[in-house]
Amino acid sequence: MAALRVQPEAQAKVDVFREDLCTKTENLLGSYFPKKISELDAFLKEPALNEANLSNLKAPLDIPVPDPVKEKEKEERKKQQEKEDKDEKKKGEDEDKGPPCGPVNCNEKIVVLLQRLKPEIKDVIEQLNLVTTWLQLQIPRIEDGNNFGVAVQEKVFELMTALHTKLEGFHTQISKYFSERGDAVAKAAKQPHVGDYRQLVHELDEAEYRDIRLMVMEIRNAYAVLYDIILKNFEKLKKPRGETKGMIY
């Protein structure tokens, strides 16, 4: 089979990209990763992430508890109105109205923390993607013998893949919190006499607070693990067979 012919100018563009990627990776390891480890460690020590009494996180839930007598009278009037009113359209419009309590806001304390956390999630995933691409471009052509360095590359790549999967899950976790909290608030508004629904809203807030702290820890740890394992194996990762440069297989 004839060898693939690559135009010199095309190869030059790939080489420029490769060199730029190597420079960025070395800058990440040399300064950016240590800086992020320090910043996230400081974030974890802030009072905002060290609330001992989680009941302080409780957000106002402006859903009035109904008076049983008034509710009974209201229900009777509603039944009478439905008997008299045969207009299905009007009935449908009434059913679409929101709860009498008005809008219920998010938990501002949780939202403020998430506004700080989400850029960190985006950043660590992007940096991990960059370093993973750099590593893949160091993998040499497949051939027999002297594959210890390649095995090291594969182990590090497996670690990076696992980290990426975990970090990507944080976005879903945050969305799930808002979805579940919204459902709990809707149930509390629809059945305001059920105290469990009210308490469920507060329980979800407390659980999310704990998760936010854990996510910050995981991001810090991701930077630390990447920094440590790449630094310890840098020569093997960059030159698995002692070659001057890696080749894409």
From Swiss-Prot:
Residues 68-98 have a biased composition (Basic and acidic residues). One of its GO terms (cellular component) is cytoplasm. Residues 60-102 are annotated as: Disordered. Keywords: Proteasome. It comes from the Eukaryota. The keyword RNA-binding does not apply. GO terms for molecular function: endopeptidase activator activity. Signal peptide: none annotated. Implicated in immunoproteasome assembly and required for efficient antigen processing. The PA28 activator complex enhances the generation of class I binding peptides by altering the cleavage pattern of the proteasome. Heterodimer of PSME1 and PSME2, which forms a hexameric ring. PSME1 can form homoheptamers. PANTHER family: PROTEASOME ACTIVATOR COMPLEX SUBUNIT 1, PROTEASOME REGULATOR PA28. This is Proteasome activator complex subunit 1. It comes from Sus scrofa (Pig). The lineage of its organism: Eukaryota, Metazoa, Chordata, Craniata, Vertebrata. The gene is PSME1.
